[in-house]
Amino acid sequence: NFVENDYVFVDNGYSTNTGSWSVYQKNDATAYKRNFDKLFDQQIIDGGKFGSSIVASTQGVDVAVGTPGVNKVNIYRKRTTLSSLQIRNEITLDYGNTAADDNFGFSLAMTDDGGALFVSAPNTGDIIKLTLSATFRTFTRGQLITGGDTGATGRVLFSDPNNDYLIVKNTGSTDFINEGINADDSSSIVTVTKVEGADGLNQGQVSWITRDTSFNYGTQQTITAPSLDRGGLFGFDMAVDSTGEYLVISAPGGPDDSTFLNQGTVYVYKYSADSSSLDYTLHQTLTPSNQEVGSRFGESVDISSDGTTIVVGSTTATDSTTSTAGRVHVFRRTGSTFAEDEILIDTTTESDTRFGTSVQISSTGKDLLIGAPNETSNEANSGAV
């Protein structure tokens, strides 16, 4: 990510897969040098994978770093002290007591001013939606719930403000909470009914996190996959326009039906300050015009700063001559509706180049970078952009 005059670079940490990141600042018109110390997760946890995802505000004041191996995101703020620039850890966002492989922090997106941060957990799964049939005290995120004749155990992922429903992650292998549940203190019992969701392993979800004027961060909304597809990987990649009006979330692993298995879907959410709920609501669902099983539409996504152009990578799509070479779909907005305007393919005749694995569009939408990491340009799988 280029941030004003700063460049963020990721490489290895001290221990196995702990990860690190460094900031480079341009010292003249052409050269970059590392201007800050290399940063590591202060806990230095094996397998934390600190630096798997990085996002920054336009001026480089706010920087968020994902550590999905331990379901965590660190937020840093750049401050000027005694004429020197420093980046310090501002806050750590913990997902709670969830499965180690939920990968909270796998993908990040941030508005230009740094006031809104979006964090995905694409491997969250086994979600059950429960409707309460009796009054019960407020549940808290991460709270342990046990009970039911199956003996299943889960933790609360989300409860709406009125406690009308809960979304619970079941930690059992196959059983689900289906009758009574009780809280940790076992003093209150409530009957619940499962109304949707079953064994949706790797459905995924996205957290919208906001910052107040005192630089305190809190979860404003949890966005779950509109389609509870097993393996959908909702939140695999994300992008947001400069103001936060349009939020793009991909689910390259869905749907889980046999017709277009793993074709992939991209969801466009819209926020309006005039809305009574002040939440992001599903605005439009994007699918490729040339539908194909296993094309993984949504492996990568980006949106122009003005919110008029969306680009979507479909890495294992097949063109007319080359198998699984990959494609990139360009959607442009007219009024409030996005429509597919262009399909880009790799100019090589190779197969499996993974064209579209990464995409980056300029702020104006006039320039587009596309990664093809498996392309054989000089050596096998040496990659190209």
Q: Can you say where each PLM-predicted feature lies in the sequence?
A:
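Conserved beta-strand/short-helix segments
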Residues: 1-125, 199-385
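Autoprocessing Asn-cyclization modules and mimics
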Residues: 1-15, 21-23, 125-177, 185-200
